[in-house]
């Protein structure tokens, strides 16, 4: 294997979703010689300073430097944090995820991916599909991809859960070519 992506759960994150992410991401990245490993989680209490009591949300950017330290400890190509709490960025009501290509880290939140959040019945399969799309999207950013105008491409920007459900979990041909170029070059 040429490298490794680590998945870092932060707080209470469902094990079945983490296992699905690890298996699915492994299946995709194995052809590039990249192993995907689930590592020991972090306590959410480490991030109390990121919590906005009025909004009842965590400011996503505060997770990224900590993930960067963990990524370096594992000598990994990238680190993906997974939380089960609501996250936001300044100027936005909420976000599904956030990436920092310079630090080679990203975070995704499951909070708004649950069908129950929208008043629909629980659907574990749908939750896992949404989580995979967000993981592929944020890792795409980590590896140098921008947002894509193709609504079916996983790199398409999701303004709402409807956008997430419309897109596939895979990169379009154009984004995939760019990703492959980046993975075999500067990000190795």
Curated annotation (Swiss-Prot):
One of its GO terms (biological process) is proteolysis. Gene3D superfamilies: Collagenase (Catalytic Domain) (3.40.390.10). Keywords: Hydrolase, Metal-binding, Metalloprotease, Protease, Zinc. It is an enzyme of class 3 (hydrolase). Zn(2+) 1 binds at residues 137, 141, 147. One of its GO terms (molecular function) is metallopeptidase activity. Binds 2 Zn(2+) ions per subunit. One is catalytic, whereas the other seems to have a structural role. Monomer. This is Archaemetzincin. It comes from Pyrococcus abyssi (strain GE5 / Orsay).
């Amino acid at each position: 294997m040429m490298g490794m992506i680590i998945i870092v759960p932060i707080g209470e994150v469902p094990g079945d979703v983490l296992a699905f992410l690890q298996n699915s991401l492994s299946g995709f990245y194995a052809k590039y010689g990249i192993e995907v490993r689930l590592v020991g989680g972090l306590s959410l209490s480490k991030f109390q300073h990121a919590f906005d009591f009025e909004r009842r949300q965590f400011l996503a950017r505060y997770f990224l430097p900590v993930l960067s330290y963990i990524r370096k400890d594992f000598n990994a190509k990238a680190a993906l944090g997974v939380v089960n709490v609501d996250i936001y960025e300044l100027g936005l009501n909420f976000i599904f995820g956030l990436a920092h290509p310079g630090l080679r880290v990203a975070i995704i939140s499951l909070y708004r991916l649950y069908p129950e959040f929208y008043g629909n019945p629980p659907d574990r399969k749908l939750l896992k599909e949404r989580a995979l799309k967000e993981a592929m999207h944020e890792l795409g950013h980590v590896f140098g991809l921008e947002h894509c105008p193709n609504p079916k491409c996983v790199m398409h920007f999701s303004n709402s859960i409807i956008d997430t459900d419309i897109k596939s979990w895979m990169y379009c041909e154009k984004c995939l070519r760019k990703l492959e170029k980046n993975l075999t070059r500067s990000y190795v």
